[in-house]
Amino acid sequence: TATTRRRGRPPGFSPFR
């Protein structure tokens, strides 16, 4: 999911994807 783009970058997730 690309929801991390608006939430920032959680541990284990990339800010780009």
Swiss-Prot record:
Entry annotated with the keyword Transport: no
Glycan attachment points: 3-4
Organism, as annotated: Vespula maculifrons (Eastern yellow jacket)
Protein's cellular compartments: Secreted
Tissues where this protein is expressed: Expressed by the venom gland.
Protein name (Swiss-Prot/TrEMBL): Vespulakinin-1
MF GO annotations: toxin activity
Keyword terms, alphabetized: Bradykinin receptor impairing toxin, G-protein coupled receptor impairing toxin, Glycoprotein, Hypotensive agent, Secreted, Toxin, Vasoactive, Vasodilator
Assigned GO CC terms: extracellular region
GO biological process entries: regulation of blood pressure; vasodilation
Family the UniProt entry places it in: Belongs to the bradykinin-related peptide family.
Keyword Secreted carried by entry: yes
Primary role: Induces smooth muscle contraction. May target bradykinin receptors (BDKRB). May cause hypotension.
